[in-house]
């Protein structure tokens, strides 16, 4: 099922959509990535948008969803399987599908469970990649935050913390090196790229996102609450 991507165009940007989770918390007989929003499967929202701005798309799914997702794709999208319910394994599976070539510029990584991304977000990442080797969206925390201690909990200032989310874009060659050497798995410094960039003094760009469009769908109630928020916003446009 694994294919290798050969690219010819300069400044090639490749997308990896992570969709191999088992949907254990989704509370539906339908797999989360196949659940329909506005008559379109969740995963198709990200595929359709990213296909307009990136040269190639890799979608990482589990074997249970493979056949169903395959029916949704055109020939320009590569579909591969990862049956380990782990984000890092899915990223590695996607990277392993890309043939190492100087013609690849950047890799954009996105969670299929964030289907409400907008064209402006992707354009912003591409523009940011012209200056920074790494760019990523984040969300400000809106709920109270506490830290577990041996005696109970300590309340912490949420303004000192950010919630990292996708989409994120990084120089392909830099990411391949850092991921394989410092993230996966033997010499791991961190599960995230940011601490490693800090360690090596590599500049990056964090972009503030909107909860309405970047909130991750975990269970069925998330879809209902997000759709309701969209309806309210549309009434005031």
What are these regions (language model features)?
Residues 2-7, 163-237:
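Conserved alpha/beta core of the MobA/IspD/sugar-nucleotide pyrophosphorylase nucleotidyltransferase superfamily
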Residues 2-66:
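N-terminal glycine-rich phosphate-binding loop and ensuing alpha1 helix
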Residues 153-163:
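A short, charged helix-loop
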Residues 79-80, 85-151, 165:
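Conserved beta-loop-beta/alpha segment of the NTase-like Rossmann-fold superfamily
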